A protein has these predicted regions:
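Surface-exposed, short loops/turns at beta-strand junctions within beta-sandwich domains
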Residues: 745-747
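Short beta-strand elements
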Residues: 763-780
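Glycoside hydrolase catalytic-domain context in secreted enzymes
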Residues: 20-737, 749-756, 760-762
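Bacterial Sec-dependent N-terminal signal peptides
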Residues: 1-26
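Flexible, membrane-facing loop/turn or short amphipathic-helix motifs
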Residues: 740-742
Length: 780
């Protein structure tokens, strides 16, 4: 019969053992003046096998568990994956495990108070090792209430501005550390190849060059060199690999891609992330060519760690080590699945019990080398020492308000929204001019007056911290002489009814303009309303529900209509482009999205966003990407157009830009030389504005087929009306390199078409020829 030891006795035993330990010697690992390497080695020498393995294991937060225990039935608890419930294990049990030092990391810890409590529990363990607390701070620390919610990643990608990502990363890190988190599961550097996938909004789009640059910038901002200090965090590149190309558009579906496609597309952003110093990488839910990514030795060990010198640690995605057994069926039980994962290079398990006992048994049986556990534990401990957690495990609750949602952070969030919103169409309707005679605007649509503008990966934020589109239009519109009214057509996109549509149309007849805010819903805390976001793949790309019927009814009144899209995957609705005079793609514009939209509609801000993906006319056109192969459209669709609705890199302005033909500093590239490409851009319109100048290349003849164009450079510039600026791009051997017929990375001799312009559309580009005379070998 077992006896329960009172907590007071546990505290006494732990306290006495540590007191005696510290009296005998001053441990090096507790000395902040010792080097990180020496502290790690000293601590490792003192740890048992069990304690090392515990550092490799993660649990969800206690409050998260308690909410599940409170809200769900027992049957739901055992079946609801998203709640992270552990069968037979409750929040009080997890708290006690933390006190015993049996947990190394937590996620879903959403308050500083809980973070401090967990760290206090961990401080009572034998070695007092602090916890590494991770969170999905995808675009700001938005799962924590009161923080700055920056535009969603797809909106940030639409700025085509690396510096925004770096600044936002730095600011996000400060808000994370202020609220008790140290590790963010971002950036998502999946290269989007199928927009049916629900997670489009958390990616940087379809081009590996743009994705890689923006991801590396975010990593630099979050980690700020080597993440040493108390205002920096660990970044996590995810999802390794090819998660953006599921065979059926659904999250976690198999990925079946060639080695060439892996090398040319999906792996490139990871190489950039590793070069940027990323310290953690998350494996993908999916299998890759028959092998679950969580047990892929070639990816984790052979390529990333041994060839590319990745120095950080790998973490599993949500319960995916278990899925090696119970979903992929390539292991007979969790113990075998754990062996396959850790032996392949996996360092941390997300999340829950049973993994530690499996790893401990495997080591004791001699099946898994102790060195593999030591390697994983050392990397995790290194992170904790560099982050300063041994000296600063808790946060100052009184200091939080001065570190989150600051005026500086708000300014950046607004500017990113202003520059990430894309003007898709404008037949002279926008901007709406200041009027002396009162004009009336009706605002309606399911996304007009709620927090859908915050995108995915956010919790409900204080209303005073969010400017909805209705609120923005009212504030700016009133200043311009407009009366702005609202009709609530219903917030649930799935349930817009005919009665609401009829009433909206009746009201529209009495107004001068109607702004209809449609799209989809990615708010994860309103699961039954969602139409986009994680695990929300769709078989169509049209406006879900009766939103198009709402727009058509209003358009039929004859009142001019402005469409604002708030969405987290591209919307394929050719009717809108054919019939509506003005369309704004706002994506998820963040805390100040409503203000940014209003400033663009009324002309205080000139739109300058560019699409980081291709928008197809219909789901039947998929896969539709700008960098397709030459034979992709050799034949055409029988009854439909073969062109996109909007091309990659596209975005309008209230002004016009005229491009010169590109010029080269020399016409032949030799091995280690750099060739400059210059183009002059003139603002020929009536407004000052930003333009994103783009450079593409095409290898005219090659030993294997190459894309019809590849993005290789971009620059955002500001031009006053009438002003001309020269933009320079650099071309070196890395710019032109590819994998030849023998999968050797090189440049083959021949001609390269260098293109510059305002989008990837051929009509927007001008070109010049660069020659390479001899084969050039390039390191990959």
């Amino acid at each position: 019969m077992s006896k329960i030891i009172p907590n007071s006795l546990i505290y006494f035993i732990y306290g006495f053992s540590f007191l005696g330990f510290s009296q005998n010697s001053s441990p090096i690992y507790l000395n902040p003046n010792a080097s990180v390497e020496n502290r790690v080695n000293d601590l490792m020498d003192r740890m048992t096998l069990e304690e090392k393995v515990y550092q490799m294991n993660q649990f969800v937060g206690l409050d998260h568990m308690r909410q599940a225990e409170k809200d769900l039935t027992e049957e739901e608890l055992h079946s609801n994956d998203s709640q992270g419930f552990y069968k037979g294990l409750f929040s009080d049990d997890v708290a006690e495990m933390t006190r015993r030092g049996e947990i190394g990391s937590f996620l879903h810890v959403l308050t500083a108070e809980e973070s401090n409590l967990l760290q206090e529990l961990a401080a009572q363990s034998r070695l007092k090792i602090p916890l590494l607390i991770g969170i999905d701070a995808i675009h700001g620390n938005a799962l924590v209430s009161g923080t700055t919610v920056y535009p969603s990643p797809i909106t940030l990608a639409s700025t085509w501005t690396d510096s925004f990502l770096e600044v936002i990363g730095t600011q996000t890190a400060k808000e994370m550390r202020a609220t008790g988190s140290h590790w963010t599961f971002t950036p998502n550097i999946d290269v989007l190849r199928d927009p049916r996938w629900g997670r489009v909004g958390e990616t940087f789009g379809e081009d590996h060059f743009l994705v890689g640059n923006l991801g590396a910038a975010m990593i630099r901002g979050l980690q700020q060199e080597d993440f040493t200090g108390t205002d920096k965090v660990i970044a996590c590149a995810k999802h390794m690999i090819a998660g953006g190309e599921p065979i059926n558009g659904l999250n976690a579906a198999p990925m079946d891609v060639s080695l060439r496609t892996l090398r040319e597309v999906h792996l490139k952003p990871y190489k950039q992330a590793i070069d940027a110093g990323v310290y953690s990488i998350m494996a993908a839910h999916n299998e890759l060519n028959g092998i679950p990514c969580h047990m892929n030795t070639w990816l984790m060990t052979d390529l990333f760690r041994n060839k590319w010198n990745f120095e950080g640690f790998f973490v599993s995605d949500w319960m995916d080590i278990e899925r090696i057994d119970d979903l992929h069926n390539v292991a007979s039980n969790l113990k075998e699945a754990s062996l396959f994962a850790v032996r392949a290079g996996m360092d941390m398990h997300m999340h829950g019990p049973k993994f530690p006992e499996a790893i401990i048994a495997l080591v004791e049986e001699g099946v898994l080398p102790l060195e593999r556990v030591n390697e994983a534990c050392e990397k995790i401990l290194t992170a904790k020492f560099k982050l300063g957690l041994f000296e600063n495990r808790k946060v100052d609750l009184n200091a939080i308000k001065d570190k989150i949602f600051t005026s500086e952070h708000q300014k950046v969030a607004l500017e990113a929204a202003q520059k990430g919103i894309v003007l898709l169409k404008n037949q002279g309707l926008l901007p709406l001019k200041t009027t002396k005679t009162k004009k009336r605007i009706l605002v309606t649509g399911p996304n007009a007056n709620n927090q859908t503008i915050l995108g995915d990966w956010h919790s409900a934020q204080p209303n005073e911290n969010v400017i909805t589109i209705l609120e923005g239009l009212k504030k700016v519109g009133n200043q311009k002489g407009y009366e702005v009214d609202f009709f609530d057509s219903g917030e649930n996109i799935r349930k817009i009814n005919d009665n609401a549509i009829s009433k909206a149309a009746q009201m529209a007849s009495d107004f001068d303009y109607v702004v209809v805010v449609v799209g989809d819903n990615a708010m994860r805390y309103r699961w039954k309303d969602k139409t986009a976001g994680e695990n929300m793949g769709r078989a169509a790309l049209d406006l879900p529900g009766k939103q198009l019927a709402l727009v058509k009814a209003i358009k039929a009144t004859g009142t001019p209509v402005i469409i604002v899209l708030v969405n987290h995957r591209p919307i394929s609705e050719p009717w809108l482009n054919d019939q509506i005079p003005a369309i704004l793609e706002a994506w998820g514009p963040g805390s100040f999205g409503g203000q940014a939209v209003a400033q663009i509609i009324f002309g205080d801000v000139n739109p300058s966003g560019k699409l980081p993906l291709t928008v197809a006319r219909d789901v039947g056109q998929l896969r539709m990407i700008y960098n397709h192969k030459p034979s992709a459209y050799f034949h055409k669709y029988a009854l439909n157009k073969s062109t996109p609705l909007y091309p990659f890199g596209y975005g309008l302005s209230y002004t016009n830009f005229e491009y010169s033909k590109p010029k080269l500093s020399k016409f032949v590239l030799n091995s280690d030389e750099i060739v400059s490409v210059s183009v002059s851009v003139t603002n020929t319109g009536n407004y000052d504005g930003d333009e994103v100048v783009q450079m593409y290349i095409r290898d005219k003849v090659s030993s294997v087929t190459r894309p019809v164009k590849e993005l290789k450079g971009y620059q955002r510039i500001f031009l006053k009306k009438g002003e001309t600026k020269k933009v320079d791009f650099k071309i070196n051997k890395e710019t032109l390199a590819f994998y030849d017929i023998n999968m050797e990375y090189c440049i083959e001799p021949g001609e390269f078409k260098i293109m510059t312009g305002s989008s990837s559309d051929d009509n927007d580009l001008q070109s010049i020829i660069l020659e390479v005379e001899k084969r050039i070998e390039v390191d990959d």
